[in-house]
Amino acid sequence: MSAKAAEGYEQIEVDVVAVWKEGYVYENRGSTSVDQKITITKGMKNVNSETRTVTATHSIGSTISTGDAFEIGSVEVSYSHSHEESQVSMTETEVYESKVIEHTITIPPTSKFTRWQLNADVGGADIEYMYLIDEVTPIGGTQSIPQVITSRAKIIVGRQIILGKTEIRIKHAERKEYMTVVSRKSWPAATLGHSKLFKFVLYEDWGGFRIKTLNTMYSGYEYAYSSDQGGIYFDQGTDNPKQRWAINKSLPLRHGDVVTFMNKYFTRSGLCYDDGPATNVYCLDKREDKWILEVVG
């Protein structure tokens, strides 16, 4: 497991899609051999040079949803060809290096050359030429097509946030400051600060999500709600409908997710930064700032 896994991330193994397909085909119908120069790119297409993070364009089982961010640790595929079973794998370096390979092959007369390429799809990340098999057959002859048996990938994702249990920090995506709790008007209230000591737990019930502080200075006053003026305070009990929030991401939530919180009572108002007289976390009309969820520990 990478060092990154200790910082709120974990490595998990998932089933992925892998297929063999014709990467290059040439029929030499002449009476002499023919040389052909072939150029291939092995590894991931469209690699971001600044980060190895991939954004899923489709789900991976129940683990990764569309839009989730992850990194690829390795890919492993077992396959059968010519009545034999084999296994091939790509390391993290091989996946991301996008290596260009050039070489020349010689095709005998009256023969068909087929290059079978093994491609893998990991949440929309297209990994080409994991492996290749070159086959020469008579033109019109029977080919031995390789078949995938199993295909798995190790991916690095944010640790899952278990509702009602996992302690998190909530960070303003633009300002890079954390939600903290201070006393205002003899109530615990939310404001931004640089301290990482303030922890929260997310809950979900019939009315939406609730945000519980673990750092209230008034016993029992712990669920974030929007006042009529838009200030964010922490309330007793769970009956107040202004405590309910909608999160713009499907479950499961994970470390590093960037989300918005829209109030379920003031339905057009979202959790946001605003430079108020004493605190600066508000729920305001037609506002929905982005917040980063960070797993604690």
UniProtKB/Swiss-Prot annotation:
Molecular function as annotated in GO:
toxin activity
Result, substituting residue 206 to A: Does not affect binding, and has little loss of hemolytic activity
Reported effect of changing residue 128 to A? Decrease in ability to bind sphingomyelin and to lyse cells
Reported effect, residue 245 to A? Loss of ability to bind sphingomyelin, and to induce hemolysis
Q: Where is this site: Important for activity?
A: 209
Effect recorded for residue 24 to A: In double Tyr mutant; almost complete loss of ability to bind sphingomyelin and to lyse cells
Q: What is this protein called?
A: Lysenin
Q: What is the lineage of its organism?
A: Eukaryota, Metazoa, Spiralia, Lophotrochozoa, Annelida
